[in-house]
């Protein structure tokens, strides 16, 4: 049985679960028209589908815990999913990281982490959660939309001068106290 709970200091090593590969099979193309965000989906051809993996982080629980909350999804004692929420200046708590072990994807673990994150954000006085996803990580973008997030912005400059140049970050917002 999967349980979702806040990760305390005694379980601090759980915040460093390994990143695992995910497929790149399309791109979300947002546009802002008439005061409303819309998007199109560009699917890659089968031969252009690829897989990528983010570098592993080395999160320091003691340093981050001053302004972060860690949420873990557990199968028994094994942490198989992680959400990191960070304090933010405005009314939306920032979902800094969200990841689920490859063997558990498609089993609603990410949604369970979002649900617990919503509880935490409300308890801390936020009206919602925001996060960002790369436009070419179509699986993540569609996941956020499926879980009630809406597009709230587009950063087309963030990767300029890096190996990721040409990509954009889509900002997603979830209102939870409507």
Predicted regions, residues:
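Extreme N-terminal starter segment of soluble prokaryotic enzymes
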Residues: 1-3
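Acetyl-CoA-dependent GNAT
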Residues: 9-10, 17-92, 96, 101-102, ...
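Conserved acetyl-CoA-binding loop-helix of GNAT-fold acetyltransferases
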Residues: 100, 106-119, 142-146
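Conserved GNAT acetyl-CoA-binding A-motif
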Residues: 121-133
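Structural motif
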Residues: 124, 146-147
């Amino acid at each position: 049985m999967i349980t979702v709970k806040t990760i305390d200091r005694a379980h601090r090593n759980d915040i460093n679960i390994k990143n695992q590969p995910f497929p790149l099979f399309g791109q979300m193309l947002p546009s802002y028209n008439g005061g409303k965000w819309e998007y199109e989906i560009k699917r890659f051809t089968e031969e252009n589908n690829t897989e990528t993996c983010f570098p592993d982080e080395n999160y320091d629980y003691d340093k981050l815990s001053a302004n972060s909350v860690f949420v873990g999804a557990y199968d028994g004692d094994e942490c198989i999913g992680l959400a990191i929420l960070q304090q933010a200046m405005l009314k939306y708590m920032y979902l800094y990281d969200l990841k689920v072990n490859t063997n558990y994807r498609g089993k609603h673990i990410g949604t369970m982490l979002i649900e617990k994150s919503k509880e935490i954000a409300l308890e801390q006085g936020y009206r919602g959660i925001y996060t960002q996803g790369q436009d070419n990580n179509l699986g993540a973008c569609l996941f956020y939309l499926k879980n009630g997030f809406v597009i709230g912005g587009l950063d087309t400059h963030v990767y300029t001068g890096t190996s990721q140049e040409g990509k954009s970050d889509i900002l997603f917002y979830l209102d939870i106290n409507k």
